[in-house]
Amino acid sequence: MSIPVIFIHKGDHFYLNYSLNQIKITNPETPVYLITDSITHKHSHVTYVDINRYFTEAKEFAKIYKHMSTNGFDNELFCFQRWYILKEFCEDKKLDNVLYLDSDLLLYCNIEQTFHQYDHFDFTISKKLSPHCCYFPSISKLKKFCDFIPKLYLDPNYIDRFLTKHQYHLTNNLNGGVCDMTAFNEYQKEQDVKALDLSLITNNEIFDDNINDADGFEMKDGIKSLLFDKGYYYGTNKETGQRIKFNTLHFQGPAKKNIADYYLGSDFKKIKRKLHFECFLNNNLFLFKVARRLGYKFY
C-alpha cells in the first residue's frame, strides 16, 4: 500500500489548500487524509475525517498536561494531542507507515521513492525538534512515542527541569517553553531511539526546516533565495557554492503569505484571484456575511 499522507488541522485556512493540492500534483496516487473540525469536501482527492472521532486519548492526555509555555494554552495542548489523534486514526484504519505533514508545507518529492529509504528509523525530524514533515515507518513506532510523552508531566526529573526552563523564559521575556518539540527532542535521548534529521544535506538534497531562516543558504527579501528547475526548487549553499535540491518548503509563521508563489498547480492564478477576493470580503464584515448567506465557499 502507498504511504498515506495525513494532515491534522483545525479550521479551514487558505494555506492548507495549497498544501493539499500540492500532494495531488506531485504524488497523484497517494492517499491523502485531512483530520479536521471543518469538513468541507472541497478537494475530491482528500478523505475528510471528523477529528472528534479520534479524540479519546487526546482528552485523556489533557488531564495530565501542565502548561509551561508563553504560547497559548489551547495551541500547545493541541500540538501534543495531534499525535494521539494520529495514532488512534492509524489504528482504526489499520495503517502502518504514515507521513504526517504540517498544513503550511509544500512537498515536491516522490513519497514512495523518498521515504521508504527511512524505514529503519523510528521517525523523521528537522533540527532534532520540528516534526512538520514526520514519517513514521510503523504504527508501533508512533505508539512508542505517544507512550513516552506522559513522562514529561509525570516523571519528577522532567517536571523540575521543565519548570525551571519555563521560569527562565518568563524571567527573561523569551517566547516558548515546553511543547511537543521538547518531547521529540527528549525522546531522541532514549536508548534505541533512532531519528533521521531531514534538515541535513544528503546527496545534494534537503528538506526545508523554515523558509524564513537561511540555514546556510543565500537569502532574498527575508526568505531563502530559490530557483525553480524541472519541478523542484534549488538553493545555493553559501559555504560550498553548490546547488541543493529542496524536497519540501516550510512556510512557517509570516511566510505563509508566500506559499502561493511556490505552489506548482496550473490553477494557481484562479486560486490566487479567489484568495484576493476573500481578503477583500474579510475586510468588509457586511459583504462577508452576505457571501456566507448566499452559500459562497471560502478557501
Where are the predicted features?
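Short, solvent-exposed loop/turn segments at secondary-structure junctions
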Residues: G11-H13, I39-T40, Y54, L105-L107, ...
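Secondary-structure boundary elements
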Residues: I25-E29, E88-L99, I139-K143, E190
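An acidic/histidine-cluster motif and surrounding catalytic segment
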Residues: E60-F73, N157-L163
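Catalytic phosphate/metal-binding cores of nucleic-acid and nucleotide-processing enzymes, i.e., regions
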Residues: L34, Y118-D122, Y153
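GT-A fold catalytic core of metal-dependent nucleotide-sugar glycosyltransferases
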Residues: F78-T124
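Short beta-strand-to-loop element that shapes/binds the nucleotide-sugar donor at the catalytic cleft/hinge
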Residues: D122-S140
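Catalytic core and acceptor-binding pocket of nucleotide-sugar-dependent glycosyltransferases
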Residues: C146-N284
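N-terminal anchoring/stem segment of glycosyltransferases
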Residues: M1-M68, E91, S266-Y299
